[in-house]
């Protein structure tokens, strides 16, 4: 008889009393501050329909979804039918993030305010390879305003996040900003083909997690030419500088509007 392990599954953690107490304190501060800004809480189910989840995170994200197999007779029928498709075996999955559930809620509840200010603090699950500082189950805290593209709304979100950090005792922190339209322009400027744009954006998003070398190796593994990878990384580094942002904003290229909106956001949040 095999020995029963007392450890949690790989990538999962137990939280004992002291950890739970600290987390409750932090979440209490987050909730108090966000609600002082007029944000309301939202909770969504742990399980979502796979049709809701699939296709929202790109091919890599889809592979990291935890799928829930059909039960009993339904699963047996699918297996007996021959070569079942993905949705024949499972049509539900664990929540991957809090953004897609928010989009579903906004689409489903037509009586929500036109400008819906919500925060959501819940665990999410990803079938990732566990590593130092990376887990398969972890908490996310999202705060968003839907129904507007105004930079004033973005500035309010930044202000709420900054106040949370100050309330928790942090003083030396940075809030990082990006703009998808500007990023797409930078990818094109580096000479990366349009059909590789999506994967490049996914890898760029990991820059703070895996570093420059990690981004370089992953883009190379996905078939992006080394010279174009170097050009992209150099362009990204230059784009972090305010002068470069102002130069881009003054132009009429594809990323100029994104640069102008980022500058407007910096001004509104100052």
What are these regions (language model features)?
Residues 2-270:
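Extended, charged alpha-beta segments that form solvent-exposed binding/catalytic grooves
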């Amino acid at each position: 008889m095999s020995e029963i392990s007392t450890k949690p599954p790989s990538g999962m953690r137990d939280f004992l009393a002291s950890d739970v107490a600290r987390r409750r304190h932090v979440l209490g501060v987050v909730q108090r501050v966000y609600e002082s800004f007029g944000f309301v809480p939202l909770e969504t189910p742990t399980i979502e329909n796979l049709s809701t989840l699939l296709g929202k995170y790109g091919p890599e994200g889809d592979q990291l979804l935890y799928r829930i197999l059909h039960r009993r007779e339904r699963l047996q029928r699918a297996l007996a039918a021959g070569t079942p498709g993905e949705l024949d075996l499972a049509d539900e999955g664990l929540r991957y993030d809090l953004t897609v559930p928010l989009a579903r809620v906004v689409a489903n509840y037509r009586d929500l305010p036109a400008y819906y200010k919500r925060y959501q603090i819940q665990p999410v699950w990803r079938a990732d390879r566990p590593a130092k500082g990376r887990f398969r189950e972890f908490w996310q805290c999202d705060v968003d305003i839907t129904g507007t593209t105004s930079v004033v709304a973005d500035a309010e979100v930044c202000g709420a996040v900054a106040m949370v950090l100050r309330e928790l005792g942090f003083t030396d922190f940075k809030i990082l900003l990006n703009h998808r339209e500007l990023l797409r322009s930078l990818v094109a400027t580096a000479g990366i083909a349009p059909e590789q744009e999506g994967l490049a954006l996914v890898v760029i998003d990991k820059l703070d997690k895996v570093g420059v070398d990690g981004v370089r190796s992953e883009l190379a593994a996905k078939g992006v030419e080394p010279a174009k990878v170097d050009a992209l990384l150099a362009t990204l580094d230059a784009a972090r500088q305010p002068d470069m942002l102002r130069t881009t904003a003054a132009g009429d290229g594809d990323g100029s509007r994104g640069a102008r909106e980022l500058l407007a956001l910096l001004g509104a949040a100052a």
